[in-house]
Amino acid sequence: MSVTSTNWVKKWSRPRYRAVVRLLLLVLLASAVAACGGTTEAEGTLPRDPIGTSASTNSDAGKPKKVERCRPGSVKRMGTARTSYAAVVRKRAIAFRQPGKSELARFGRLNINGVPTVFAVLAKRVDRHCGVSWYRVQLPMKPNGITGWIRPYAVNLVPLTTRIAVDLSARRVTLYVRGKKVLAARAAIGTSATPTATGRYYVNQRLIPGDTSGPFGPGALGISAFSEVLTGWTQGGPIAIHGTNRPHLLGQAVSNGCIRIHNDKLARLFRRALAGTPVTVSA
């Protein structure tokens, strides 16, 4: 062996060689433990959760969750100037004057004209867990504007973003969607002898006549209002917003209480205003 080889052996026979060997043994041992499912202290640290859902980084961990509570029997208004709700009867519904007291009327899935029975939802009564126990709704019956209470399981709730305003003095019908005016139409209204009833109502039925060139035009939006004069009429004299075959009379007080608008405007209104849409008729 050369001198150089001898020096190499002597050099690595020193304590440095023994330290390197011990280090290699530790590395091999750590690898073996990790392969069996163990971890070193560094490997046991969880990575940071980028969306904040990890228990190790969630500042709310361990805190009791807040449970919403309501005063049993409290009534909360539903709807705003931009949104409202309709209740569509599933099979049958019973309306009460007060929750569970004094039955007012019974309704089937379809009304007398064969279209779905719909109510306008005004408020809800809640239990202590804030669940809905009753809906206060406007009913499509006399007297005008009558309300009642129905069970939530009897109906399907439908959100709406449309609203109709009828200004009798201006002879105008306006449609709003999410609070924005999207359509305005000149209207013919009831005469002084057969006036159009004022108040807050809703679209309770959408009807397409057999003859779309007749006095009702291409369609009619029945509202939950009735003539207060023509009480002997069929179905109690219901009021509707409909088209006309006499457009030259628009802007005048010539009807029996219904609100007539141009057929083109009616077609657009009919497409947008679903059943349950609030309707305000002002003098």
Regions found by a protein language model. Name each.
Residues 33-35:
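C-terminal motif of bacterial Sec signal peptides marking the signal peptidase cleavage site
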Residues 152-190:
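A structural motif detector for short, solvent-exposed N-terminal "entry" segments of globular domains
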Residues 46, 141-142, 154-163, 191-202, ...:
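Exported/periplasmic cell-wall-interacting domains
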Residues 111-153:
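SH3/SH3-like beta-barrel superfamily modules
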Residues 37-39:
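Bacterial signal peptide processing site
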Residues 52-127:
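Beta-loop motif signature
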Residues 1-18:
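N-terminal secretory signal peptides that target proteins for export/translocation
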Residues 44-82, 138-166:
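Boundary regions of SH3-family modules and the immediately adjacent low-complexity/disordered segments
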